[in-house]
């Protein structure tokens, strides 16, 4: 009698065992992966738990996100998706990043044009503030003129992002192989090389963007006409004006951005809070502040770059004749329009 319950329960136990095996088969996962190295590519996301030696701690998984408004002035590679070996995710991020960048740059186009206008035409004798600059632009070309140059600014998003991501991925694989995560220093170097390469290739588009942003009503018929006039009147070298200060600007931007971000991490650690899971507001504030400081550090070179890109032999830029950034930087340091520089720097940030 004692063996009969075992015979009646044996089939049900087998069924339970079978279901457990099927469930285990479909939910089977490999060993837990090592903690991912954060993609602190100086302009976008997380470095918590990495810079300060917390490599053994598991970080919460997070989807790729861009936490800084794209106005076209961010230098470093701003993505998390590069850490994922998934080309589909990369292209999805490229598409979503391009669409978001187009919206954000279009929304900030009036301020961007006012900034460039103030950077080029302001001087100690010709003081210009934000309202005065916007008023001058509207009087010259109307409300629609505030969006001049926005087309090329949006158009260069796709090649800029694609070159940055491709070069970054190749450099990362070269440093540490395809399936290994590079140290933070090598990741920073890979990001800098990617930015330098992309800026080298799209510098002609930057010059066209500056010229179209500053153009008078009826000066150019469009993008191709602007490029044709530059090539005919100034030569091919004009398309690479401002290249040197643009490259030099990567150094103070990257170093300042990184230093501020690490300082904020130290403050977060000393506060006794959990570093592994900072809130979205904390992460956004840290990235925004570090990026702002980086832009402030590189702003003098950005100003020199813009003035060199705007100069020309004919047209409204004929009063500018700088072929070397050093004389222009020296002139700005000895006789700066302080108030106007502050206003245009605020718009730049």
From Swiss-Prot:
The gene is SLC25A41. One of its GO terms (cellular component) is mitochondrial inner membrane. Belongs to the mitochondrial carrier (TC 2.A.29) family. GO terms for biological process: ADP transport; ATP transport; mitochondrial ADP transmembrane transport; mitochondrial ATP transmembrane transport. Signal peptide: none annotated. It is found in: Mitochondrion inner membrane. It comes from the Eukaryota. InterPro entries: Mit_carrier (IPR002067), Mitochondrial_sb/sol_carrier (IPR018108), Mt_carrier_dom_sf (IPR023395). It comes from Bos taurus. This is Mitochondrial carrier protein SCaMC-3L. Calcium-independent ATP-Mg/Pi exchanger that catalyzes the electroneutral exchange of Mg-ATP or free ADP against an hydrogenphosphate and participates in the net transport of adenine nucleotides across the mitochondria inner membrane. Keywords: Membrane, Mitochondrion, Mitochondrion inner membrane, Repeat, Transmembrane, Transmembrane helix, Transport. Solcar repeats lie at residues 88-174, 182-267. Its main location: mitochondrion. GO terms for molecular function: ADP transmembrane transporter activity; ATP transmembrane transporter activity. The chain crosses the membrane at residues 88-104, 149-168, 188-205, 243-261. It catalyses: Mg(2+)(out) + phosphate(in) + ATP(out) = Mg(2+)(in) + phosphate(out) + ATP(in); ADP(out) + phosphate(in) + H(+)(out) = ADP(in) + phosphate(out) + H(+)(in). It is a multi-pass membrane protein.
